[in-house]
Amino acid sequence: MSVCTEIDYKLYTELRKIAGNSLFLFNEDGDFVEVVSNSSFKFLLPVGLFSSMDIPLKKPIECNTDNDIEHSKNVVMPNLYPFQERVASEVLSSIKKKVELKRPMYVTLHLACGFGKTITTCYLLSVHKKKAVICLPNKMLINQWKRAIESININHLVSVDGVGNLLKELVKKPADILIIVSRHLSNKEFCKKIHVDYDVFVLDESHMYNLMNNSTVTRFLTYYPPKICYFLTATPRRVNRIYCNDVINVSNSSDLKKYIKIVEFFFETYSSDTIRQMVKKLNTNYNKYHMYTEKILAEDVPRNKLILDTIIYDFEKMIVNRLIIVTKLRKHMMFFYTNLIEKFGSDIVYLGDAKNKNISDIVKKIKSINRFIFISTTNYSGTGLDVPTLDSLVICSAVMNSMQIEQILGRICRYSISKTRTVIVFPNTSIKEIKHMIGFFTQKIITLAIEKLGFKKIDKKGNKQEFALCKAFNLQTR
């Protein structure tokens, strides 16, 4: 259970530093309310808050971790890279220190996309040898985790048919590791069971949850706090530190050669009846999240042609080999799929459509192919798509926040035999009404890629053979 207490001014100040403008917690009556300074009410402070040495303990927090896995001698320890071993060592040292100081064993693993958070976590589970729950935001990540848990030879159960069926199955067949989706936590009976019977809780892609909202995960961490808890993310939300306040971020020296190619082109102004109708909604509430900006961009015929020409040229010249193309809209995705499958055929071009029930089979297939083009949306590919062999990324959309950008770029930052990674962006549009907006958001992608993730801008002078760039240079010199 969380720590029920009044919040004095000093603690309130610390909490506001983490939460920002508004701080919401459950009060002692179970209401999720905003906390104000000098309140006389009592609130439930998540135990994970006290995992940081900067927060004074209200009382010692001791947990008995006695839910050992069966057949612990059969566990296979995974092989880690040196930089992953460094993280695992630091985490285990932190856990040991927390036990000594009677603080909660909560750690956020803030590790870059492609670092290997899944295998590193499996190593930690192998060391703990305690029963664990792995909580995922969606089913798309299940296969990735299932393969990883199978590799360490621990008895596990994957829940795909709902929490009710899982509870029935656990009566017949106990499991050392459960792989679930987060909506299972809306079931109180299930929460009580894992609180009692499981010691470790892993919240994968923790940035997907805003724990300042009254969500199932927020309630679970408040009322059924795990004994050992790991948050995994490449792009942490600061507010979530209230629930897991010790962050380990070990930078690794990557030997990947990462480049970002900026394909600039000065278009003649283009429009159509469809575009003109959508332009009317640009400065209205309909475009609050830039949905119409992206819809208009998807209708940009000259820009779409430039993207296609660039992809075809680079793929035929083997400049890119294992390529992922991402769009914001499904319609835009289908446009590129239709054109590219006509050019290269179904043995090369694959569709990453979340609506396709066989999508996991497609992802599995491309992992074994030497050259392919995989076309998907930012929604499907942004988090959890695990194809380590990807070496190139074409971004057709523009409007993304920093977290989304880093997640998308992370699709090609995983370790594989190939060491070169290329991102291709298109900062120009032929539609004058969104010209500056597209330029602004594309520059945001470029800046984050270079300054935070270590990509290098390709010198345009060294790429005059490339069709799209060559056309752009010719236009500029006329």
Swiss-Prot record:
Location of the motif DESH box: 204-207
Keywords: ATP-binding, DNA-binding, Helicase, Hydrolase, Late protein, Nucleotide-binding, Transcription, Virion
One of the record's GO cellular component terms: virion component
GO biological process: transcription initiation at RNA polymerase II promoter
InterPro entries the UniProt entry points to: ATP-dep_DNA_Helicase (IPR050615), Helicase/UvrB_N (IPR006935), Helicase_ATP-bd (IPR014001), Helicase_C-like (IPR001650), P-loop_NTPase (IPR027417)
EC number: 3.6.4.-
Subcellular location: Virion
Domain Helicase ATP-binding: start-end pairs: 98-254
Sample GO molecular function, one term: hydrolase activity
PROSITE patterns per record: HELICASE_ATP_BIND_1 (PS51192), HELICASE_CTER (PS51194)
PANTHER family attached to this UniProt entry: HELICASE A859L-RELATED, RAD25/XP-B DNA REPAIR HELICASE
Function summary: DNA helicase which seems to act as a postreplicative transcription termination factor. Involved in ATP-dependent release of nascent RNA. Forms a stable complex with single-stranded DNA, and to a lesser extent RNA.
Protein family according to the UniProt entry: Belongs to the helicase family. Poxviruses subfamily.
Protein name: Transcript termination protein A18
Organism name: Yaba monkey tumor virus (strain VR587)
